[in-house]
Amino acid sequence: MSQDKFVYPERYEIQEVCENFIKRRHLNQMMQEKGIFGISASTEELSQIMSNCIFDAVTIDDFRKNAIQCSNRNNLSGFLITSSAKDLSVKDIYEKARDNSNLKLSRQYRLGMLVKETRDGKDYFKGKLDYEIRRPGRIQFMDKETGSCEFYMFETKNNEWQVEVDGTRSSDGKEVQKLFTQLMDKSITRIHVLDIDCLKDKQTIEFFDEIIKRGLPDEWKFQDVVALTFRRGRDEVEENIENEDEEKSKTTPLTGIRQAILEGGNLRDNEFVHKFEENGCIFSAMTLEYQNASTPETIHIRAEFKGSPKIFEVSIVNIFENEGLEAKKEQSSLSVKKNLEVRTAFWNNARIIYNEIVSKQ
């Protein structure tokens, strides 16, 4: 698998990205880190200045990531790899596959180089996967459309590795999972995902209720549930089939409603939601509002079982900054690093909750 080639952008590309895709506050920060101060200049003027500068590869990558964040909503998903063999090294398996030009993989996967980084004093490896997107009834000019995502893998304990996927499509996490499924020896390894089908109906509600309590560390204070998706429970559907004649003589205000998507405030205590719970339902997605304890930042995090199969993923869908004496919420953004840190913390806490619930079955 060939090494990714760095191509320096054209001047107009830098100017266009700075002017239209990067938030002003991040543009100021990036300039100041390079010793350039232009606080009173317009965004257009700053973009022209930046286009005339020469930057290293790391800074260019920061431009790219910030621009992508402004135009896409990144989601984080992941899985665990365990093995009955001794000395499992997912890193070594991946690198051997990457260096093997004769290895045949589906989807025309391109495996990027692994980069060693550190999180909370612990080493991990960052990689990149490019893959071909296949669509039914493909249109010719879309033939070469590709997906791309970054992933992070680290050893949690002997013979156990965790892989986290930072992508812009729900399919990204599943593609990374498919890749490692092809690379691993299926007779001695298992891949564990957060799949809603492994939870009973009431356990899906327990899962999201625990997320409300334990989703993020104390730096972020939970405020409200601002969106909620739920549907009729699997247990209820099976019971209705078995007792179809009896059900025909009984009707409730919820008869015929199979799924509901609510947006607003105080949704966890909503009367309609409680009635649905009484009749048996599954929670599949929730958007939670958090307020930062030390800064005027407010975020909306969407926690969702999505796709087929429905795998758990996390995304930040809204970012606000409270401004003025009235603390009016204005649209804002987080740095790429902080955005990823928040999603990672949330997903890992959700993974702990999920495993606790599944272990009780």
Where would I find each of the regions flagged by the language model?
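Intrinsically disordered, low-complexity, charge-rich terminal extensions
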Residues: 1-361
